[in-house]
């Protein structure tokens, strides 16, 4: 499944290199027009990251996200610095289909597990941003990648399986925004270990060959941001390569 994505800072479409706010590219595009184009080309899920909200929770772009949701028919998944239940429920109330929770799942697992129980496992996607160390361990980073988390991907997945974890988005930080290709070995490994989870691959996608490689890896979806913005290929071409299930 192809999941086109946009990152937003102060209402503008941007891309960061490896999650670094100092290495930002701004695109002169209307977020709504861009997402409408992805929708018209056949996307069955869209992904939005509120980078302003991730950095400064009191400046979350909820009004803009609400406007986008109201003007699109495609289900939308939203992430970016969700720290409280109020923020989660607000996004669900304005019509967001699924909320992406990252750092908090590492820092306060019991709290996030209670949300799975309350809102259901379809309403939440865990974002696991990993640094792979020299020993090959997949260490989940927290706080917008600015600090290490110290928990392994496997230990977190085991913990959240108890509350029915169904959707997880995994990014190899070393690939994000680089157009260097996806870490297909990573996706193959986790999809083999946990076939019951819908794995979304993210980071590094540059070509349709990359899309094909991720499709073969066992991931169920692929998030594509920068490659679409710089016209490496279109959503339509990507879907032709990997039709929506």
Swiss-Prot record:
Organism: Shewanella pealeana (strain ATCC 700345 / ANG-SQ1)
Active site: 7, 129
Keyword Mitochondrion: no
Gene that encodes the chain: hisA
Location relative to the cell: Cytoplasm
EC number(s) on file: 5.3.1.16
Name used for this protein in its record: 1-(5-phosphoribosyl)-5-[(5-phosphoribosylamino)methylideneamino] imidazole-4-carboxamide isomerase
Gene3D superfamilies recorded: Aldolase class I (3.20.20.70)
PANTHER family: 1-(5-PHOSPHORIBOSYL)-5-[(5-PHOSPHORIBOSYLAMINO)METHYLIDENEAMINO] IMIDAZOLE-4-CARBOXAMIDE ISOMERASE
GO terms, molecular function: 1-(5-phosphoribosyl)-5-[(5-phosphoribosylamino)methylideneamino]imidazole-4-carboxamide isomerase activity
Keyword ATP-binding included in the entry's annotation: no
Taxonomic path: Bacteria, Pseudomonadati, Pseudomonadota, Gammaproteobacteria, Alteromonadales
Record keywords: Amino-acid biosynthesis, Cytoplasm, Histidine biosynthesis, Isomerase
């Amino acid at each position: 499944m192809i999941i086109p994505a946009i990152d937003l800072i102060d209402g503008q479409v941007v891309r960061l290199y490896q999650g670094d706010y100092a290495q930002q590219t701004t695109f002169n595009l209307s977020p709504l027009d861009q997402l409408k184009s992805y929708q018209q080309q056949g996307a069955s899920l869209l992904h939005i990251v509120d980078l302003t909200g991730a950095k400064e929770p009191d400046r979350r772009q909820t009004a803009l996200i609400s406007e986008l949701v109201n003007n699109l028919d495609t289900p939308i998944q939203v992430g970016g610095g969700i720290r409280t239940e109020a923020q989660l429920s607000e996004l669900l109330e304005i019509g967001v289909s699924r909320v992406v929770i990252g750092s908090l799942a590492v820092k306060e697992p019991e709290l996030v597990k209670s949300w799975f129980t309350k809102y259901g496992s379809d309403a939440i996607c865990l974002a696991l941003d990993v640094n792979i160390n020299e020993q090959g361990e997949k260490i989940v980073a927290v706080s917008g990648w600015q600090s290490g988390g110290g928990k392994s991907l496997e230990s977190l997945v085991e913990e959240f399986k108890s509350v029915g974890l169904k959707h997880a988005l995994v990014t190899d930080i070393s690939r994000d925004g680089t157009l260097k290709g996806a870490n297909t070995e990573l996706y193959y490994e986790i999809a083999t270990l946990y076939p019951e989870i819908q794995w979304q691959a993210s980071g590094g996608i540059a070509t349709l060959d990359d899309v094909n490689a991720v499709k073969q890896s066992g991931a169920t979806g692929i998030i594509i941001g920068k490659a679409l913005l710089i016209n490496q290929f279109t959503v339509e071409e990507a879907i032709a390569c990997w039709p929506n299930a």
